[in-house]
């Protein structure tokens, strides 16, 4: 790995960018908790308040672990967000349950989630990088 200031700055910036959506969603959830609970009700999850709190915790704690990478444990945050993101596909973006043209629209959202997972895998791999 190159040991340069530019590489380190780029790595830090990439950690912020790969978690940006999760930060925004988590912060939004803190201030609009009832809406997040209603989302859990809509997808049919039991204990919607617990799942809403868990969702917000996962988004914020996972993001913080990636960005701050304490003692090289950012990979745990990556793993949290990978599992969370993959679970949102069958729970919130089940494209196979729709007919066209909605099926294609939701399928594209699922593909975007897969792409985010790829970025999170890279963040897990770089979690051990030390300047």
Model-derived regions: residue spans:
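Extended, low-polarity transmembrane helix blocks
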Residues: 1-32, 49-61, 68-131
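Short juxtamembrane and helix-loop transition motifs at transmembrane-helix boundaries
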Residues: 15, 34-47
